[in-house]
């Protein structure tokens, strides 16, 4: 087969799905996986069959694609702004159970205005647990919740957070951040109860923090995504081992212009340029070449991967497999996944960032 291409080990995917579902089930917590990690209908349906309560998406476009593939309970973990998006949200909410993230009263009011002739739209308040991206500060959540309760056509279901700063942490800090993430939203729930505001969902989520989130009483849902794959960043964080990484990039050595340097046919358009999302670099190079630990993918052009090494190296024409740094980005750059060299899975929601 021609390279570069993405290879999937189905057995590892199935094991990763089962282990995360077992973790959630054992704590009587719902698992609502984030499908932005794979954007693939086959994997989504494997997750739902294993027991997931629904799915999480980053964008409305992903929600539309996944609904066509069978998803019925969808959380859009992103603020929806603009008339065109609201038109699409109303249409989707007529055929699926949709919940939307909010962190702003004005945005929520404009969204609710579109649901006068339908059932109310469910919302979760996003709480900032340290990422400093979207989300209200914890001590502002009560005021927003009280305001949302006065908005017609809106149903406040709960609160959620994402401690994405964990990707800039050292492995030793992952547990601490996971507990902090969970305690933050549980504390918000407790504060709401003092005002007789009862919510059903207290949601946290990331692959590194999931197993620590479930240690905190009061969390009702986790939303990891990358766990289906795992990748070099997860390995660098100490969250996974290379043997738990289900996605690899197959590439071919196409040049060896001088001693200590070779070139592969996978560049930034395949491997991405991610070396750690939120600060600390926990990876070396642009992926791990399996079986060749002394090789470093030092730099990328669009179609070239420049590899440096000391000692032995693969020859021109030889194929190598690479565990990417960030699997979610790599999948979004591809059209297809080759599964155990027997099946072809489409990346159905590729490019659906709309």
Please name every model-derived segment.
Residues 34-167:
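Active-site-proximal beta-alpha core segment in soluble small-molecule metabolic enzymes
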Residues 29-30, 192-201, 316, 332-334:
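Flexible, glycine/charged-enriched surface loops at secondary-structure junctions
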Residues 12-43, 56-58:
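N-terminal glycine-rich anion-binding loops that anchor highly charged ligand groups
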Residues 260-354:
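C-terminal accessory subdomain/extension
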Residues 121, 128-241:
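Active-site loop/helix belt of alpha/beta enzymes
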Residues 1-8:
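Generic N-terminal amphipathic, Lys/Arg-enriched alpha-helix
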Residues 13, 36, 66, 125, ...:
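Conserved, mostly hydrophobic/aromatic
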Residues 209-288:
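Active-site loop ensemble at the mouth of alpha/beta enzyme cores that anchors a bound cofactor
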């Amino acid at each position: 087969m021609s390279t570069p291409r993405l290879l999937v080990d189905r057995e590892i995917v199935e094991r990763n799905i089962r282990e995360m579902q077992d973790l959630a089930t054992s704590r009587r917590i719902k698992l609502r996986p984030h499908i932005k990690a794979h954007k693939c209908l086959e994997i989504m349906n494997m997750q739902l069959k294993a027991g997931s309560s629904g799915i999480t998406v980053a964008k409305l476009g992903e929600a539309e694609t996944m609904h066509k593939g069978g998803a019925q309970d969808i959380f859009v973990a992103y603020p929806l702004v603009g008339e065109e998006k609201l038109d699409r949200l109303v249409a989707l909410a007529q055929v699926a159970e949709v919940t939307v993230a909010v962190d702003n009263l004005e945005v929520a009011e404009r969204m609710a205005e579109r649901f006068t002739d339908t059932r109310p739209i469910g919302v979760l308040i996003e709480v900032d647990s340290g990422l400093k991206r979207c989300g209200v500060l914890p001590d502002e959540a009560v005021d927003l919740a009280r305001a949302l309760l006065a908005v017609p056509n809106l149903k406040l279901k709960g609160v959620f957070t994402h401690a994405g700063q964990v990707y800039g942490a050292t492995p030793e800090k992952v547990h601490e951040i996971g507990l902090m993430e969970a305690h933050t939203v549980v504390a918000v729930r407790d504060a709401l109860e003092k005002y007789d505001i009862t919510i059903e969902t207290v949601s946290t989520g990331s692959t590194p923090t999931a197993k620590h989130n479930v240690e905190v009483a009061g969390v009702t849902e986790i939303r990891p995504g990358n766990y289906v794959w795992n990748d070099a960043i997860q390995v660098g964080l100490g969250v996974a081992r290379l043997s738990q990484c289900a996605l690899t990039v197959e590439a071919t050595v196409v040049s060896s212009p001088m001693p200590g340097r070779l070139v592969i046919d996978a560049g930034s358009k395949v491997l991405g340029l991610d070396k750690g999302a939120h600060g600390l670099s926990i990876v070396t190079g642009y992926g791990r070449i399996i079986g060749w630990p002394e090789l470093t993918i030092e730099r990328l052009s669009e179609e070239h991967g420049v590899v440096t090494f000391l000692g032995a190296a693969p020859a021109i024409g030889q194929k190598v497999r690479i565990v990417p740094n960030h699997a979610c980005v790599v999948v979004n750059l591809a059209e297809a996944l080759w599964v155990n060299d027997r099946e072809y899975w489409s990346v159905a929601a590729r490019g659906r960032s709309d």
